[in-house]
UniProtKB/Swiss-Prot annotation:
Organism, scientific name: Bos taurus
Keywords for this protein: Cytoplasm, GTPase activation
Keyword Cytoplasm: yes
Primary localization: cytoplasm
Identification of the protein by name: Rho GDP-dissociation inhibitor 3
Compartment annotation: Cytoplasm
Disulfide bonds: none
InterPro entries: Ig_E-set, Rho_GDI, RhoGDI_dom_sf
GO BP, one annotated term: Rho protein signal transduction
PANTHER family: RHO GDP-DISSOCIATION INHIBITOR (PTHR10980), RHO GDP-DISSOCIATION INHIBITOR 3 (PTHR10980:SF8)
Physiological role: Inhibits GDP/GTP exchange reaction of RhoB. Interacts specifically with the GDP- and GTP-bound forms of post-translationally processed Rhob and Rhog proteins, both of which show a growth-regulated expression in mammalian cells. Stimulates the release of the GDP-bound but not the GTP-bound RhoB protein. Also inhibits the GDP/GTP exchange of RhoB but shows less ability to inhibit the dissociation of prebound GTP.
Family from the record: Belongs to the Rho GDI family.
Molecular-function annotations in GO: GTPase activator activity; Rho GDP-dissociation inhibitor activity
Amino acid sequence: MLGLDACELGAQLLELLRLALCARVLLTDKEGGQLPPEEALDEAVPEYRAPGKKSLLEIQQLDPDDESLVKYKRALLGPVLPAVDPSLPNVQVTRLTLISEQAPGPIVMDLTGELAALKNQVFVLKEGVDYKVKITFKVNKEIVSGLKCLHHTYRHGLRVDKAVYMVGSYGPSAQEYEFVTPVEEAPRGALVRGAYVVTSFFTDDDRTAHLSWEWGLYVCQDWER
């Protein structure tokens, strides 16, 4: 698997590649026409034309005679992957894992099965402990930009917390990616103990809903209710 450091580096390189390719397209695209307002980069630069989104194959085939760019793309994107099942989604979120050095072991949420069943599962979190969340996912077909994971936490029907984790940008890979959140401290005290409902979303800059699911969380004095 790919660890967090590799993912962060890959995300930064992917963004650089996208910017370089967008600049190249911008310089070579001479067609006229009026763009929708949301596609304008800056009203102060009326000549700007937002480049169209390119597929991974188009990026790999772009400027084959530019040796430096070809080497850069090969180092960044790796070899061309074998064809994948077209029915597979571009992004697959496979697991969410709660990690704490104070826990008996990792708490793993399998996201490949029936998501509705997670509503009936309750994951226990001991109050006051330090913990991290690891998100495991795959990218199958195209580069995806600005992945993020959101958690909305509810108690008695009212939202009491919203967490947003910026996961980054990734290219297709035969291996799973892992993203680990910064360390957080679980709430503590009699007022926060009890049951919560969490609605989680995995989305991107294009607002594509790659996955959404609901699960139960219970904060108590120990790792067992």
